[in-house]
Amino acid sequence: MVRIASGEMKERLAVYFIMGSQNSERPAADVLKEALDGGVTLFQFREKGPGALKGADKEALARQLQRLCRAYGVPFIVNDDVELALAIDADGVHVGQDDEDARRVREKIGDKILGVSAHNVEEAMAAVEAGADYLGVGPIYPTSSKEDAKEAQGPDVLRRLREAGITIPIVAIGGITAANAKTVVEAGADGVSVISAIASAPSPKAAAAALAEAVRAARTR
């Protein structure tokens, strides 16, 4: 296995859907399938927060969602659970600044995809040095999807990272919608990452398709 190429990583970040069982009143597998039909390009299993599954139940759901992703050829990333990622042979792991050290995670997962959350230039540079394949940057806009979300920074944080010489793929997160996706891509993001914009939508398929079209339009300018 070899590390994912930067160009492929950028393409995969176009529409990055994050969810767990706690993010929708509907079964997670139903929501994910519709989102995949709509054009999601990367998926992160984030089973955290009040009511989140644990142990065998968490692993069973992870495997179910992973099978869906494989059927669509979409990489399956696990949030902050290296042991689970290794147990099910996930495609990668994403860690935040308060999770396990990124350098240690890289050592454990080998060449699997490693994503790291960053909120400023210093954190971004440290993540690059630790071996991150992409950065999750935000929150760009106010969000209620994450109980521990920091203050929104606006698209300018993306410009600051690019101006500081950060060249690895970046996905923007936090309050992203089809209406503002163009703005964040133009500011320096390679794609958008969402939870509620898809998970809470009346039609996850239509929501994913709208995001995909917005990112595509911004990229081709």
Curated annotation (Swiss-Prot):
Its EC number is 2.5.1.3. One of its GO terms (cellular component) is cytoplasm. The keyword Magnesium applies. Pathway: Cofactor biosynthesis; thiamine diphosphate biosynthesis; thiamine phosphate from 4-amino-2-methyl-5-diphosphomethylpyrimidine and 4-methyl-5-(2-phosphoethyl)-thiazole: step 1/1. One of its GO terms (molecular function) is thiamine-phosphate diphosphorylase activity. It comes from the Bacteria. The keyword Nuclease does not apply. 4-amino-2-methyl-5-(diphosphooxymethyl)pyrimidine binds at Q44, F45, R46, E47, K48, N79, S117, K146. It catalyses: 2-[(2R,5Z)-2-carboxy-4-methylthiazol-5(2H)-ylidene]ethyl phosphate + 4-amino-2-methyl-5-(diphosphooxymethyl)pyrimidine + 2 H(+) = thiamine phosphate + CO2 + diphosphate; 2-(2-carboxy-4-methylthiazol-5-yl)ethyl phosphate + 4-amino-2-methyl-5-(diphosphooxymethyl)pyrimidine + 2 H(+) = thiamine phosphate + CO2 + diphosphate; 4-methyl-5-(2-phosphooxyethyl)-thiazole + 4-amino-2-methyl-5-(diphosphooxymethyl)pyrimidine + H(+) = thiamine phosphate + diphosphate. 2-[(2R,5Z)-2-carboxy-4-methylthiazol-5(2H)-ylidene]ethyl phosphate binds at T143, S144, S145, G175, I195, S196. Keywords: Magnesium, Metal-binding, Thiamine biosynthesis, Transferase. Binds 1 Mg(2+) ion per subunit. Gene3D superfamilies: Aldolase class I. Mg(2+) binds at D80, D99. Its cofactor is Mg(2+). One of its GO terms (biological process) is thiamine biosynthetic process. InterPro entries: Aldolase_TIM, ThiamineP_synth_sf, ThiamineP_synth_TenI, TMP_synthase. HAMAP family: TMP_synthase. Belongs to the thiamine-phosphate synthase family. NCBIfam families: thiE (TIGR00693). Condenses 4-methyl-5-(beta-hydroxyethyl)thiazole monophosphate (THZ-P) and 2-methyl-4-amino-5-hydroxymethyl pyrimidine pyrophosphate (HMP-PP) to form thiamine monophosphate (TMP). This is Thiamine-phosphate synthase. The gene is thiE.
